[in-house]
Amino acid sequence: SHEALGAKFVNFSGWEMPIHYGSQINEHNCVRNDAGVFDVSHMNIFDFHGPQTQEFMRYVLTNDVNKIKDYQALYSLITNNEGGIIDDLIVYKFNNDKFRVVSNCSTFDDVKNFFKLNIEKFDCEFSHKPNLGILAIQGPNSEATLSKVLDFPLYRYINSFSFLYLYSPSLPACAYEGDLFISRTGYTGEDGFEVIGDHQKLQKIWDLCISENIAPIGLGARDTLRIEAGMNLNGTDMSIKNNPFESNLGWVVDFSDIERDFIAKENLTEIKESNKHKLVGVLLDEKGVLRGGQKIIKNSFEGEVTS
């Protein structure tokens, strides 16, 4: 499907990914002004279940899942014991006993090993779901567009950072067996949805999107959209060498429940008070392109462009 649409491919963490389908600029503007569809099946999906799943999530995540209700989502980080960022992710709560996590593809081994190491103390199990893929439909017209494709009134049932399961009787436009996971989340700064299902179901939805003249969007525009929206990319804007506070992500470290213990809590408390570095946005006044690794010098201070 991607090749037929004129995709140019690049290697991204071992995945052959469409970088664009002809014009990265047009794709970027399409998402800002209308709607576009991304194949982001390179992302990793982990499912967790068991009577202590909520307790496990409260321990391993910097953010606190106690603040969300069933069928809501939360952005968070996982860190090592020193507070270095392993990955950023979105966690989805079905109920206290069942959660889903979507994390980056480049950190698969680190994230899987992190969960495996820390889950032993809890009555909880987890599994990786390579049989599932993800489509992202993003843009100001994404709700109307996806509702039409699925023949389902999404606006009635799903708010920002929440999700639902749709079953086949609700989706006459995509005949399939089983269910479909739809969240109102994204990585563009626009309204949007992410759809998780098996690859056969997603192929049907992709084809329906294309038939409705929804533009396919490549990795290049995905990157410029998230930069424009001020969203970090793990491995570029942050890494295991960085803590949440210097990465402008202190807001996802939740200290509000003083009784909650979580990984690196003590170290992160100290870092919060002493941190001297900070990730900030930069606007170029004149024509030109800022490249990763370039130095920015002001008075006696020196910084470096990350994205």
Predicted features by range, described:
Residues 1-13, 17-19, 25, 93-307:
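Conserved, structured C-terminal
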Residues 1-79, 84, 220:
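Acidic, proline/glycine-enriched N-terminal capping motif
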Residues 40-52, 92-100, 138:
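N-terminal glycine-rich flavin-associated loop
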Residues 88-90:
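Short, surface-exposed charged micro-motifs
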